[in-house]
Amino acid sequence: MKMSSRTSKLFAPTLAAGLAIAGFAQQVADPDFDTRVAKPAYSTKHPKVLLDEAHNNFHTAGGRYKPFADLITNDGYQVIPNKQKFARDTLKGFDVLVIANALGAIGMNSPAASNSAFAEDECDAVRDWVRAGGSLLLIADHAPAGGANEKLSLRFGVEMSKGYTADPANHDGDNEGSITYTPDNKLIAEHAITRGRDASERISRIIAFTGQSLKGPKDSVAFMKLADTAVDLTPRGQGVEPGRASAAGRAQGVALKFGKGRVVVLGEAAMLSAQVAGPQKMKFGMNRSGIDNRQLALNIMHWLSGLLK
């Protein structure tokens, strides 16, 4: 998630919660982003995607994730917003569940935002649904989103740092939280998601626009690996112990198979959005030029829906 320019230069454990989320209200979907797909992956069969909007989500199909929802719709998916708590009947009949920045309370500024967004029975329902063959895309940004989503991610063995992650050696511009992933810096791992179906879909450059770090289970693939220079930083007021720690060996993109299903967990949400921020309408997300975030979104969905093996 993109932070304000002031915040991006203040990565420190003492960063106040108010500063950490400054500028969120100015983030809006880019109305000029081109979501057309020249050759849709699905033209007859249309996998059903449930996009969550029932858990105080910062990103929704009609809001900041509209470009993502429109893009995958144009690729042949049937996207349906979710307005209910997760249960077996809620998930029945869907192929992919997408959850983007669910929160424990409305608004990133809320002191309760880092509380779990999901009840225990909801987490069990999602776990059982994936085990039976469903696919989950769980996206949880920097604080407070990590705390709100870790109860669910742990059902699949994925730990969340629950703070902010920066890399002084691999970043875009002057924001050390905007981490850059390329084959040259060896932070993009080989996986069906990064290979795509052919050379035209291979991922060569990703930017994550300030998120958190993840640690997947042994059988997972960290397709967006963090460098040894990456650090996790947690300011006060985020619902977890403030401090600074190495993020070496962790990731911002993890893929795994779980029972008959598949799971992708991302530690940053803006990279699959297309947003503009501030009076200068600064672009961040899939609408940034020179990056493969748009193709990454499609490849992730292709893997989750079984098009990529």
Regions of interest found by a model, annotated:
Residues 2-14:
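Bacterial N-terminal signal peptides that target proteins for export
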Residues 24-309:
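Short, surface-exposed patches at the edges or C-terminal ends of soluble domains, predominantly
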Residues 12-22:
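Bacterial N-terminal signal peptides
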